[in-house]
């Protein structure tokens, strides 16, 4: 059966649906009772409001048969039977649904209307029997044979709907789940195989095995994989990451471990904006980390990697003032540089260790963010501030902040020069302040300006330029 969920208005002309019948079947005097207007005013209210008074389920069911019976229609107060011309066009409404008597052809188990058939007789026939019934299943099972007279039936056969509501085909791999892999013992156990075969999802198609299942070298790297991370190495890797870390104890030649890195707590504090450990003020960050980190981490790195055994190369960038004498006496600098051609001496061993890294190119401090290496820990500390945006050094004059103390020192010199200019400004601004205009009432030959009495450097000023005439 043809179905539709939406309620539509369909204009129908009576003369187009019926066959021509003989004029002598029924008396002519009974024709006036056959013309009825179902909806005298179709524009009043919504379609559902008009249909609520016709039937309990909001639908009109008309079954026109060939026998002559009296007209029996329950009309509401708004729908009164009125005589209408023979070929008058009227509007009817109805709901259509799939007949559930065809199994598999309907997607709705409970249909709204099983069969909807409208038998419309031409005006020359006798008054037809129009019955409104809520149960339409008692109608004729064959809608095409409703009567010997002309019948307009909307129906659709079963084969026309099979392609619309046909069930999906079964999975193509439903019965061959156990034949996908010839030898599943190489990869899965028997229990796993039986469990996977009962899954609802179809398994992937089978492919030929590249190697026999008994080949012990199928995955040669698996047995040796735990050797890369022994338990002792894992404890060292997940231990406290600080400047006093010892050299990597695992004898792995293929695994190269980088030198001591910046503590994650330091980067986390910088990233979250919290104060780093050991800092109490804007200038305490650079002052505390500078002397503390080089003495401890530099000594540990020197002992771990033995930078003295590395070849010493000459410094690519020599000192700006190589012959400048040091302020510290020689006897107070007992640590000379062992590099050939370098006359530098230091009073502390950690200073010598940092200096030797210049010759060896050793950079044991690595940034965890960009993996850049540095030879000094304080250089790494200032470099991390470029990632975190930390600027702990503020200017005392304008409040501008800097990431390095030398940048603040260089900026402070600008304020000092401006202060010197302001102090020398009053002496240079006296001539400009002493130059005054003449009184407006003075004439060209009159007395001198009032500013003539002012003196600069003991000398008296001449008359104003406006009164001075050149010969």
Swiss-Prot record:
- Enumerate the residue ranges forming zinc fingers (C2H2-type): 335-359, 365-387, 393-415
Where is it localised?
Nucleus
Q: What top-level class of enzyme does the UniProt entry assign?
A: transferase
The Gly residues compositionally biased stretches are 280-289
Annotated Gene Ontology cellular components are: cytoplasm; nucleoplasm; nucleus
- Main location per UniProt? nucleus
Q: What does the entry's PTM section describe?
A: Ubiquitinated by WWP2 leading to proteasomal degradation. Acetylated at Lys-246. May be deacetylated by HDAC6, HDAC10 or SIRT1.
The UniProt family comment states: Belongs to the EGR C2H2-type zinc-finger protein family.
- UniProt function note: Sequence-specific DNA-binding transcription factor. Plays a role in hindbrain segmentation by regulating the expression of a subset of homeobox containing genes and in Schwann cell myelination by regulating the expression of genes involved in the formation and maintenance of myelin. Binds to two EGR2-consensus sites EGR2A (5'-CTGTAGGAG-3') and EGR2B (5'-ATGTAGGTG-3') in the HOXB3 enhancer and promotes HOXB3 transcriptional activation. Binds to specific DNA sites located in the promoter region of HOXA4, HOXB2 and ERBB2. E3 SUMO-protein ligase helping SUMO1 conjugation to its coregulators NAB1 and NAB2, whose sumoylation down-regulates EGR2 transcriptional activity.
On subunit structure and binding partners, the annotation says: Interacts with HCFC1. Interacts with WWP2. Interacts with UBC9. Interacts with CITED1. Interacts (via phosphorylated form) with SFN.
What name does UniProt use for this protein? E3 SUMO-protein ligase EGR2
């Amino acid at each position: 059966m043809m179905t539709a969920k939406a309620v539509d208005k369909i204009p129908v002309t009576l003369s187009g649906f019926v066959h021509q019948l003989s004029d002598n079947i029924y008396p002519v005097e009974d024709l006036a009772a056959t013309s009825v207007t179902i909806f005298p005013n179709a524009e009043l209210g919504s379609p559902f409001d008009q249909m609520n008074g016709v039937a309990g389920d909001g639908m009109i069911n008309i079954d026109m048969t060939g026998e002559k019976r009296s007209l029996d229609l329950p009309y509401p107060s708004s729908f009164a039977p009125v005589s209408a011309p023979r070929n008058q066009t009227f509007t009817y409404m109805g709901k259509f649904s799939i007949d559930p008597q065809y199994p598999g052809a309907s997607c709705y188990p409970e249909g709204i209307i099983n069969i909807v058939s409208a038998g419309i007789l031409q005006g020359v026939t006798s008054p037809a029997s129009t019955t409104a019934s809520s149960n339409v299943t008692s109608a004729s099972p064959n809608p095409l044979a409703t009567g010997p007279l002309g019948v307009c039936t909307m129906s659709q056969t079963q084969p026309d709907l099979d392609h619309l509501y046909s069930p999906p085909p079964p999975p193509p791999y439903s019965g061959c789940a156990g034949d996908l892999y010839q030898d599943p013992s190489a990869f899965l156990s028997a229990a796993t195989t039986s469990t996977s075969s009962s899954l609802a999802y179809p398994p992937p198609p089978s492919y030929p095995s590249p190697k026999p299942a008994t080949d012990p070298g199928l995955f040669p790297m698996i047995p040796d994989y735990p050797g890369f991370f022994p338990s002792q190495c894992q404890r060292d890797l997940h231990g406290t990451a600080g400047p006093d870390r010892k050299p990597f104890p695992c004898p792995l030649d293929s695994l190269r471990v980088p030198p001591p890195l910046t503590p994650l707590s330091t980067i986390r504090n910088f990233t979250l904006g919290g104060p780093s450990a050991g800092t109490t003020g804007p200038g305490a960050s650079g002052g505390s980390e500078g002397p503390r980190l080089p003495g401890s981490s530099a000594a540990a790195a020197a002992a771990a990697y033995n930078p003295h055994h590395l070849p010493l190369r000459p410094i690519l960038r020599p000192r700006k003032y190589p012959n400048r004498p040091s302020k510290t006496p020689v006897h107070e600098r007992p640590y000379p540089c062992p590099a050939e051609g370098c006359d530098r001496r230091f009073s502390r061993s950690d200073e010598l260790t940092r200096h030797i890294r210049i010759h060896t190119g050793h950079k044991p401090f690595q940034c965890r963010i960009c993996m850049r290496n540095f030879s000094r820990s304080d250089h790494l500390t200032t470099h991390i501030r470029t990632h975190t945006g930390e600027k702990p050094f503020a200017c005392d004059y304008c409040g501008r902040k800097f990431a390095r103390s030398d940048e603040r020192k260089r900026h402070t010199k600008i304020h000092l020069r401006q202060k010197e200019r302001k102090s020398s400004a009053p002496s240079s601004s006296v001539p400009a302040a002493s130059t005054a205009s003449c009184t407006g009432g003075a004439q060209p030959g009159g007395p001198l300006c009032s500013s003539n009495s002012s003196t600069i450097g003991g000398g008296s000023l001449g008359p104003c330029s406006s009164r001075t005439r050149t010969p």
